[in-house]
């Protein structure tokens, strides 16, 4: 009798977890996703408001990132783990107590690891839900692009640089600081993979805007002229709601014939693939720069017939990068050895 009750309870639990008719699909991955993301969110908000200063450079000069220490929404951040910790895994039980753990930035690792595992689980949950519904797996493939970006920035880059103190601070101003320092140290703007990522993101935005405007402009009229086109649409209807041939003809004449798609599947695959591939490349670029395989440096690359270099915009950019680099962690650097 007891085993029967346990069997029924387990079956009911499995049915609840894996049912695709729930208002919110849970899934087996969801058992990991929701606790992990909840812990990361609570820890982040708490640290953003209340965390003490963190000795990010490992030189006993702590940096405050929480609101209680006078920061605002723009300047506030969860400060990365101390350079004294390096790339060591630093849970609470590895410290002498909570005060030391907070001082060394243990909160940063806590938030980053729980968040990253949570979004990886979310990607698995997307695959699982698609599988339950008999759908193809392209949704989770597309979501792999931001997962790859998160892995590159939060995991691979700090490991490649030898310390989680080089990770991106979890705040608005901290993000921009990370970007400027990344450019100064790695010449990311001159890296081909970053250029492909920019083309992917901005190109994807352009293509999405073009597609949305074309669809909205070629809706099939099912109503009288005095009525809204929306009144002729029934949610979930099998009939097409817009004329792809009309949109194709318009765009083909606006640009040239072969610039448009006359196949809906090809069109939407292109809209999905373009930004995803671009972000994949950017993530790969950040992962390579983590190990100092940097972007191009054209400093002093133009020479006259006597062998003297001629200043160019590349030299101006290089000088700006050097200025940013010596301003960064200025108390930890030994000027001018950092410029060598």
From Swiss-Prot:
Residues of the site described as Tyrosine radical intermediate: 157
Subcellular location: Plastid, Chloroplast thylakoid membrane
Binding site residues for chlorophyll a PD1: 194
Residues reported in the UniProt entry to bind Fe cation: 211, 268
Database matches in Gene3D superfamilies: Photosystem II protein D1-like
Transmembrane segments: 25-42, 114-129, 138-152, 193-214, 270-284
Keyword Chloroplast: yes
Site keyed Stabilizes free radical intermediate: positions: 186
Cofactor note: The D1/D2 heterodimer binds P680, chlorophylls that are the primary electron donor of PSII, and subsequent electron acceptors. It shares a non-heme iron and each subunit binds pheophytin, quinone, additional chlorophylls, carotenoids and lipids. D1 provides most of the ligands for the Mn4-Ca-O5 cluster of the oxygen-evolving complex (OEC). There is also a Cl(-1) ion associated with D1 and D2, which is required for oxygen evolution. The PSII complex binds additional chlorophylls, carotenoids and specific lipids.
Free-text description of this protein's post-translational modifications in UniProt: Tyr-157 forms a radical intermediate that is referred to as redox-active TyrZ, YZ or Y-Z.
Catalysed transformations (reactions): 2 a plastoquinone + 4 hnu + 2 H2O = 2 a plastoquinol + O2
GO biological process, one term: response to herbicide
Pfam families associated with the record: Photo_RC
Protein residues bound to [CaMn4O5] cluster: 166, 185, 328-329, 338, 340
Gene Ontology molecular function, alphabetical: chlorophyll binding; electron transporter, transferring electrons within the cyclic electron transport pathway of photosynthesis activity; iron ion binding; oxidoreductase activity, acting on diphenols and related substances as donors, oxygen as acceptor
Topology class, membrane: Multi-pass membrane protein
Positions of a quinone binding: 211, 260-261
Description of how the protein assembles with itself and partners: PSII is composed of 1 copy each of membrane proteins PsbA, PsbB, PsbC, PsbD, PsbE, PsbF, PsbH, PsbI, PsbJ, PsbK, PsbL, PsbM, PsbT, PsbX, PsbY, PsbZ, Psb30/Ycf12, at least 3 peripheral proteins of the oxygen-evolving complex and a large number of cofactors. It forms dimeric complexes.
Similarity annotation: Belongs to the reaction center PufL/M/PsbA/D family.
Leftover remarks: 2 of the reaction center chlorophylls (ChlD1 and ChlD2) are entirely coordinated by water. Herbicides such as atrazine, BNT, diuron or ioxynil bind in the Q(B) binding site and block subsequent electron transfer.
Function statement: Photosystem II (PSII) is a light-driven water:plastoquinone oxidoreductase that uses light energy to abstract electrons from H(2)O, generating O(2) and a proton gradient subsequently used for ATP formation. It consists of a core antenna complex that captures photons, and an electron transfer chain that converts photonic excitation into a charge separation. The D1/D2 (PsbA/PsbD) reaction center heterodimer binds P680, the primary electron donor of PSII as well as several subsequent electron acceptors.
Protein name per the record: Photosystem II protein D1
Organism: Amphidinium operculatum (Dinoflagellate)
Species classification: Eukaryota, Sar, Alveolata, Dinophyceae, Amphidiniales
């Amino acid at each position: 009798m007891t085993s029967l009750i346990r069997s029924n309870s387990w079956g009911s639990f499995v049915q609840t977890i894996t049912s695709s008719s729930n208002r919110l699909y849970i899934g087996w991955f969801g058992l990991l996703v929701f606790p992990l993301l909840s812990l990361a969110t609570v820890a982040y908000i708490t640290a953003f408001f209340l965390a003490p200063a963190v000795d990010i450079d490992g030189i006993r000069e702590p940096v405050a990132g929480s609101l209680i220490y006078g920061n605002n929404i723009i300047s506030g951040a969860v400060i990365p783990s101390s350079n004294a910790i390096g790339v060591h895994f630093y849970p609470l039980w590895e410290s002498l107590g909570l005060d030391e753990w907070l001082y060394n930035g243990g909160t940063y690792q806590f938030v980053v690891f729980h968040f990253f595992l949570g979004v990886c689980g979310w990607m698995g949950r997307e695959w699982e839900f698609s599988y339950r519904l008999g759908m193809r797996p392209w949704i989770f493939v597309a979501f792999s692009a931001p997962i790859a970006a998160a892995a590159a920035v939060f995991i691979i880059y700090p490991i490649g640089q030898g310390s989680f103190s080089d990770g991106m601070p979890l705040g608005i101003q901290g993000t921009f600081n990370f970007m400027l320092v990344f450019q100064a140290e790695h010449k990311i703007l001159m890296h081909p993979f970053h250029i492909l990522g920019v083309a992917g993101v901005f190109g994807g935005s352009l293509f999405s805007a073009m597609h949305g405007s074309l669809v909205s402009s070629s809706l099939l009229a099912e109503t009288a002229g005095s009525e809204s086109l929306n009144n002729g649409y029934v949610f979930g209807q099998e009939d097409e709601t817009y004329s792809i041939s009309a949109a194709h003809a318009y765009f083909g004449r606006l640009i040239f014939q072969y610039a448009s798609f006359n196949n809906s599947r090809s069109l939407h695959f292109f809209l999905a693939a373009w930004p995803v591939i671009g972000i994949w490349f950017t993530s790969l670029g950040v992962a390579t720069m983590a190990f100092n395989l940097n972007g191009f440096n054209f400093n002093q690359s133009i020479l006259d017939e006597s062998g003297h270099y001629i200043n160019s915009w590349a030299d101006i950019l290089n000088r700006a990068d050097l200025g940013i680099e010596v301003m960064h962690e200025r108390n930890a650097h030994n000027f001018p050895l950092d410029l060598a």
